[in-house]
């Protein structure tokens, strides 16, 4: 059985989360011209910032 491709929106969210954990700026979003993907990336970034502020990650 073939492995399904990942959902591109989920991948954008995950990449945004990783960027947020590493303390990168939201201006470094690789999806500047693609609003749908940018929205998911920023959602992941915001989730990471919230997790950092609550002390879940350093």
From Swiss-Prot:
Keywords: Cytoplasm, Translation regulation. It comes from the Bacteria. InterPro entries: Ribosome_modulation_factor, RMF_sf. The keyword Oxidoreductase does not apply. One of its GO terms (biological process) is regulation of translation. One of its GO terms (cellular component) is cytoplasm. Transmembrane segments: none annotated. Signal peptide: none annotated. It is found in: Cytoplasm. Coiled coil: none annotated. Residues 1-28 are annotated as: Disordered. During stationary phase, converts 70S ribosomes to an inactive dimeric form (100S ribosomes). NCBIfam families: PRK14563.1, Rmf_CrpP_fam. Belongs to the ribosome modulation factor family. This is Ribosome modulation factor. It comes from Idiomarina loihiensis (strain ATCC BAA-735 / DSM 15497 / L2-TR).
């Amino acid at each position: 059985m073939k492995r399904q491709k990942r959902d591109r929106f989920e991948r954008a969210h995950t990449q945004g989360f990783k960027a947020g954990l590493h303390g990168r700026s939201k201006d470094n979003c690789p999806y500047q011209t693609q609003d749908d993907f940018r929205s998911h990336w920023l959602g992941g970034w915001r989730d990471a910032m919230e997790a950092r502020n609550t002390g879940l990650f350093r």
